[in-house]
């Protein structure tokens, strides 16, 4: 856990330093470049950090290595991710490379998105870590790739341009098909979230909340059949504190809707995103698997909350207004105080969410493990570099076996000397016989 707080502290210090002397585009881009290097490197060098690392993505990459002719469409992974794995496997047989490539891809896309669409890249980056989106990227790799790709559809959603919006969502769905839920959202978003609509949403939410089992039973008959009602991810429930936190985040955006829409009427999109982030997190308290749909909407918070902060900050000339005692500056002083309280509330609330998320460790990122510190990995790299040395050990054992008494059957002796199959050689350390869906505990040396 200390690793992540050091990381957060470094990002906070950098954010403060880069804002000295005022913000400008060049400083924003340099800051994002440094953030990209720090976050991508930390994620790329992880080992068994994130539940899906050990029993999903590392074995999945080894499967592609062992069967390079596997079809893009003949696997339970989506074709976009399968294509990515095949491309990585073409250049490297080191399974860690899939985590290097996906880390660079995910963090790179987030930084590009913030560079293009965030009104305050510094606050966006801090919220990206505080709201556990960074830790989500270490666990739900395919869905995070889909989610960050889908973020680029928001500008087209604002402009109500369905075709480019649809194309981006379809690309996202090639990494995780759950992204297709964003297609009907386009039409839902055509209805602004007014107070009356909000009341209707609340009523519908209440009805759906107490009928989730019927809905899940119907859906899993046709889609995601592995998530039937007996599945552990369906039976398990998500903790209420996360739903409460998501409700607070929604209320922040909802109560600031007037300022957001005053700046740009199309910004009501963020209010809808905030509501559905809360909606699916709430449904996750019934069936935890439903919370995963909130990912596509949660990723918008590092855009919407900084935008609201920017709107508030534009209502006064500078932070010095807090200390200006002139009567004519009363309004500026009040606006500055409100903005300061808002920022403090967001950061303190974010820290609380961050601490609780790491304590509960839903993404399996605690403790952080670095691949370079694992002794077996050095042996793994040596075997990749010198594969011709591997058969030497069984050959040396042949001598004492040949000297056995004559009555020892030769066929049995020869079977003892057989080399492991390539599939066995390529298995991950401590990966044999791992039950599907269970995290792997790797003891530290």
Describe the residue ranges of each PLM region.
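Specific aromatic-rich, kink-prone transmembrane helix
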Residues: 145-161
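Transmembrane helical bundles and short interhelical boundary loops of multi-pass, membrane-embedded
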Residues: 273, 281, 288, 328, ...
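Membrane-interface junctions at the ends of membrane-embedded or membrane-associated helices
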Residues: 22-24, 159-164, 307-336
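Membrane-embedded helix bundles of polyisoprenyl
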Residues: 122-140, 144-149, 178
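Transmembrane-helix signature of polytopic, membrane-embedded enzymes
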Residues: 26-27, 111-131
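Short hydrophobic/aromatic helix or loop-helix immediately within or flanking a transmembrane segment
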Residues: 54-63, 70-93
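Alpha-helical transmembrane segments and terminal signal-anchor/GPI-anchor hydrophobic tails
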Residues: 49, 54-58, 64-65, 186-298, ...
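Membrane-interface alpha helices of multi-pass inner-membrane proteins
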Residues: 133, 153, 164-188, 204, ...
